């Protein structure tokens, strides 16, 4: 990290003042902690909503992008919450409507590899508000009422910013050729809930891999086997 900041010409500034940070921003990336409580079985998301409230009070036209790990359905629930909140507020002058501009773009950072994984991302995923089936009509109606204009375009612009800041990947794999225009970084756009689910299912799959190989190690110990030899042999299967 020190080498990167020392050698790269970067236009960065830092502040602890949220008002000055948000007032002229086109995009506000929210990466607040959302600690999971296994006893209560929920994510503590109040830090995210604290940031959202401040952004809306300072720069309501900014597009907010949540990066934090959140439960599936959380972003759409925020559209419902703020649609209800907006109806109780004083109308804006000249008949203008209050807008809520929220996207979700999960991060896939490994421990101690955050800078590398930002420069060489495995994929970029951006979720934006899309209409769902009739059973989700309350959410759909809230989105219709308050979503900002051109949210899909806002998602595409944000992805371009991430690509611009990345170093990019190599095109050794012919499958990656389709992503040539995005520096060979797979870039996907989808609904908010789908993007939230991608993050959680990826985490779950990685946890299952760890659990599986822990079981393998336990079995090898009981049977007097060399676990590393087994893992090496299993891992050579291209499907694994």
Predicted feature locations:
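Structural/interface elements that position substrates and couple domains in central-metabolism enzymes
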Residues: 1-240
